[in-house]
Amino acid sequence: VRTLRAEGRNVLAWSPTGRADDTHAGHIDTSVLLSLAHPGVDLAAAEPGVTLPLPDIIDDLRRGGLAAVSPNGVLGDPTHANADDGAAVLDRWTDTLVAAVTEWARRD
């Protein structure tokens, strides 16, 4: 994005936000998938992973990938995930994306 903007291109970068200790296959991701009725979600198989904040593990994650920081590949705790939480997260993400695009479009 920085390079594109330096080249004079009007671009927007947006990514969904969440808790720093729940960043991959944890409560948030699993709840979102449940809200979308994803057939691959098996809560009976859900188990907690590493729940350290992302800033605490980011260097190891960049060096060695997910396996370097979490034996089961989970960064968070999906065991209490549910579709209602997932729907609320999707609503929040949608609102923040629409707001970001609206603000970005005003600058054009």
What are these regions (language model features)?
Residues 1-108:
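Extended, histidine- and acidic-residue-enriched regions that form the cofactor-binding/catalytic faces
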